[in-house]
């Protein structure tokens, strides 16, 4: 049985470009919005709590862009041509895709846009979620 990703995928694809925000056109009516996150240092993890979060340690990150919103089903459909989500709702986050499907999505997204998207690292995700240093947008 294939492993299914049940968490929502935030289009946290990251790539290096200049500017504060960017709109990525997927087709005439569907867009991705990405926001600039100024790099910096922060403490990742914790010395208390869950074992897999230990130990707390300092991380240094370069500037990056990250998706402003979770990837919607309509954005997925615009790139892939189908919807993997069990409960259709085009404005809702896409879910229930396999890791392989997600990697195929990124590959196709890169071809469609001519950019180099990827998933963020754990550190990039946590830093952005905490507001980074000077997150714009």
Region locations from a protein language model:
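Extended beta-strand/loop cores of jelly-roll/beta-sandwich
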Residues: 3-5, 11-123, 130-133
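Chymotrypsin/trypsin-fold serine protease catalytic domain
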Residues: 136-137
């Amino acid at each position: 049985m294939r492993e299914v990703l049940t968490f929502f995928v935030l289009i946290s694809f990251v790539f290096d470009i200049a500017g504060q925000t960017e709109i990525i056109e997927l087709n005439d009516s569907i867009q991705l919005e990405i926001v600039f996150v100024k790099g910096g240092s922060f403490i990742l993890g914790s010395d208390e709590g869950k074992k897999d979060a230990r130990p707390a340690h300092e991380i240094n990150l370069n500037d990056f862009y990250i998706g402003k919103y979770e990837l919607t089903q309509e954005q997925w459909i615009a790139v892939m041509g189908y919807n993997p989500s069990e409960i259709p709702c085009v404005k809702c986050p896409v879910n229930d895709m396999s890791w392989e499907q997600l990697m195929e999505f990124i590959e196709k997204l890169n071809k469609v846009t001519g950019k180099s998207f990827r998933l963020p690292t754990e550190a990039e995700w946590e830093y952005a979620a905490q507001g980074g240093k000077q997150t714009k947008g």
